[in-house]
UniProtKB/Swiss-Prot annotation:
Belongs to the short-chain dehydrogenases/reductases (SDR) family. It is an enzyme of class 1 (oxidoreductase). This is Dehydrogenase/reductase SDR family member 6. It comes from Danio rerio. One of its GO terms (biological process) is siderophore biosynthetic process. The gene is bdh2. The active site is at Y147. Pfam families: adh_short_C2. GO terms for molecular function: 3-hydroxybutyrate dehydrogenase activity; 4-oxoproline reductase activity; oxidoreductase activity, acting on the CH-CH group of donors, NAD or NADP as acceptor.
Length: 245
């Protein structure tokens, strides 16, 4: 018996990093997983894994999100992960940077929740997990202005949905990681003028002396997706190795 036997789970940004690790972990625990991403080539790496179906979806496009939702009679767990990290202070953030980041990090979750929530309400049962960050309303982080703002908005969205639909059988929580060793992080490091120094800077703020792994976050995701966490809602679940302390 798996911890997620029979649960229907839809997640975004599943082609790599936390999304990919979570999709695999969900399937291993018996869930029926639909893994979506905008990157069709990377998403193919999940093809053939028992319990996982893949679908290319741009979660910033309402028509694509609505079409995805129509494919399901019901969904037990919706996991919103899609996000973008902008580097810089408010002075480095152009209006286009602001709009792009808020569109990917916040509006996509709004679209996904709005599309799938009615199906959950019809069954008086549903579980929504949103990816936020310690870099948010939890902790001020240098050169993460619009990113932190967007993730603070995700925390607010999470609490609002949890409060509005608590009595109707809906749970909504968000995960707030610190620095996670993912392909996205490695790409951002390599894009910096001095990648070696950038990596040292990331490591210097890790009080545990190492980065979090995507698999460690996925273990937490399994717990939040399972019935083991039925009394948990409206919560920012932090997994940061003590970075915020």
């Amino acid at each position: 018996m798996g911890r997620l036997d029979g649960k229907v789970i839809v997640l975004s940004a599943a082609a790599q990093g936390i999304g990919k690790a979570s999709a695999i972990a969900f399937a291993k625990e018996g869930a029926q997983v639909t893994a979506t991403d905008i990157n069709g080539e990377k998403l193919k790496e999940l093809d053939g894994i028992p319990g996982i179906k893949t679908k290319v979806v741009d979660v910033t496009k309402k028509d694509q999100v609505d079409a995805l939702a129509k494919d399901f009679d019901h969904v037990d767990v919706l996991f919103n992960i899609a996000g973008f990290v902008h580097h810089g202070s408010i002075l480095d953030c152009e209006e286009s940077d602001w709009d792009f980041t808020m569109n990917v990090n916040v509006r996509s979750m709004y679209l996904m929740i709005k599309a799938f929530l009615p199906k959950m309400l019809a069954r008086k049962s549903g579980n929504i997990i949103n990816m936020a960050s310690v870099a948010s309303s939890i902790k001020g982080v240098v050169n993460r202005c619009v990113y932190s703002t967007s993730k603070a908005a995700v925390i607010g969205l999470t609490k609002s949905v949890a409060a509005d639909f608590l009595e109707q059988g809906i749970r909504c929580n968000c995960i707030c990681p610190g620095t996670v060793d993912t392909p996205s992080l490695r790409e951002r490091i390599q894009a910096r003028p001095d990648p070696e120094q950038a990596f040292k800077d990331f490591m210097a703020r890790q009080r545990t002396g190492r980065l979090c792994t995507a698999e460690e976050v996925a273990h937490l995701c399994v717990y939040l997706a399972s019935d083991e966490s039925t009394f948990v809602t409206g919560t920012e679940v932090i997994i940061d190795g003590g970075w915020r302390l």
